[in-house]
Amino acid sequence: MVINNNISAINAQRTLKFRQVDLKK
């Protein structure tokens, strides 16, 4: 379960990064 939580957190960080890039565009 801890691993799943870590993966979800990493995915959230990735989505935030992609959103920031889109905003920059």
UniProtKB/Swiss-Prot annotation:
Q: Which gene encodes it?
A: flaB1
The main location is periplasm
User: What subunit structure does UniProt give?
Assistant: The flagellum consists of an outer layer composed of two sheath proteins, flaA1 (44 kDa) and flaA2 (35 kDa) around a core that contains three proteins flaB1 (37 kDa), flaB2 (34 kDa) and flaB3 (32 kDa).
- Cysteine pairs forming cystine bridges in this chain are none
What is the name of this protein?
Flagellar filament core protein flaB1
What does the protein in this record do? Component of the core of the flagella.
What's the family?
Answer: Belongs to the bacterial flagellin family.
| Organism of this sequence | Brachyspira hyodysenteriae
Q: Where in the cell is it found?
A: Periplasmic flagellum; Periplasm
Q: Which GO terms describe its cellular component?
A: periplasmic flagellum
Q: Which UniProt keywords apply?
A: Bacterial flagellum, Periplasm
Q: Record keywords: Cytoplasm included?
A: no
